[in-house]
Regions:
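N-terminal secretory signal peptides that target proteins for export/translocation
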Residues: 1-5
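Bacterial N-terminal signal peptides
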Residues: 7-20
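Beta-strand-centric surfaces of beta-sandwich/beta-rich domains
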Residues: 24-380
């Protein structure tokens, strides 16, 4: 018994030393509330500088609002935004961009709503460890976003009407010493396929023999969440779907190709499985800290869904590159619309982002792709 206790004590001491060593060389993203912190908390906000109650900004069409323009070293820890706009789909028409250390191309570029998991262009409540939408229409991000020299955050109004009121509070830690060497930078990238192009429209059910017999090992026609070059790790994805065809949209598998591999070393068994549900989500919405489906639509043309998954248990690491994808239907037989934002950390510089689709292209619209139920698709 004494020997067992000593062994257990040795294990505890070893773990403590390992943790202490880790903490000395990594950013303090976890707070020990019993210890004095080594940062100064700062905030930039839309608060009325006069002390009156006009605590918002307006954004004219075609204008850019700078939310943050701060020197480092620092780490953004929380973003809160709420918007009042009369324009339909303003969540698709406002674009969030974040630039680190005076870079000329953004490390974050996405429609405002999509960044916060509202890829359908409509508000709905949901909650996770990293992103949430509170009542009413309150957008929150808790991603840690370090910067060594400088951080600049902007929102562009690419719509046709003025944003009547744009409120924001951004909290960040200001450090007196440089960030640790090798610190990875936060990135987020929007992509869409409106529509995905399935290899056939001649099918009636997802399980038709000609569909099930089709094989896909190289993932060349998969929907792409992310193509990134450099060293880093993939943290997760939010995705929304507008169905152009009847039936369950989520027969496609997730496939991750790491460091240029020809065949994915990480491959899944179905879309709802990747998002940690099962059996078409049972037709019921749900959201938890790391995964969920806040919107589960009818399995028909015109149906809408929103899903998310965060890999905080084990981010997907890469040393040279990552190609993160998902099939659209089994072996890519379906032609639904996908809208997504991938979130990851990596060394700079990052690879060029795809050109952001135009405002008109970002608005959800059903597409004439053929297949079951396609003629019944209606504008959302």
């Amino acid at each position: 018994m004494l020997c067992t206790c000593r062994k257990f004590l040795c294990i505890l001491v070893f773990c403590f030393l390992q943790r202490s060593s880790f903490a000395q060389t990594h950013l303090p993203t976890n707070i020990d509330l019993t210890q004095q912190q080594d940062y100064v908390l700062k905030r930039v906000s839309s608060a009325d500088p006069s002390g009156a109650n006009a605590d918002f900004r307006q954004i004219d069409p075609g204008s850019v609002l700078t939310l943050m323009d701060a020197n480092g070293p620092g780490m953004l820890t929380h973003i809160w935004i709420t918007v009042a706009s009369p324009e339909a789909y303003h969540l698709k028409k406002l674009v969030l961009r974040i630039y680190w250390d005076h870079e000329t191309t953004p490390s974050v570029e996405a429609p405002l709503g999509d960044f916060f998991g509202l890829g359908l262009g409509e508000f709905h409540l949901w909650e996770s460890e990293l992103l949430s939408v509170g009542s009413d229409k309150a957008l929150n991000s808790f991603f840690f976003m370090p910067f060594q020299k400088h951080a600049r955050i902007t929102v562009s109004n690419e719509g046709r009407q003025k944003v009547d009121a744009f409120y924001f509070n951004l909290d960040y830690r200001a450090y007196s010493q440089a960030l640790p060497r090798g610190t990875l930078y936060f990135h987020a990238q929007f992509r869409q396929a409106q529509p995905n192009h399935g290899w056939t429209s001649d099918w009636q059910n997802n399980g038709d023999p000609q569909v099930d017999r089709k094989t896909n090992l190289d993932g060349k026609e998969n929907y792409v969440w992310l193509d990134a070059a450099g060293r880093g790790h993939f943290v997760g994805v939010t995705m929304s779907v507008l169905q152009n065809q009847d039936g369950w949209w989520g027969e496609g598998d997730d496939m991750f190709f790491i460091d240029g591999e020809a065949r994915s070393s990480i491959a899944g068994t179905g879309s709802e499985d990747y998002f940690l549900g099962a059996w078409n989500f049972g037709g019921h919405p749900f959201f938890y800290q790391l995964y969920g489906a806040p919107v589960v639509g009818e399995e028909r043309a015109g149906g809408k869904s929103s899903v998310y998954r965060f890999h905080l248990d084990s981010p997907i690491t890469f040393q040279k590159s990552i190609h993160a994808t998902m099939e659209h239907g089994h072996a890519n037989h379906r032609s639904d619309n996908f809208y997504s934002v991938a979130y990851w950390y990596q060394s700079e510089p990052h690879a060029p982002f795809p050109v952001l689709p135009s405002v008109d292209q970002r608005i959800l619209r059903p597409q004439p792709v053929g297949g079951p139920g396609n003629s019944a698709a209606v504008h959302p």
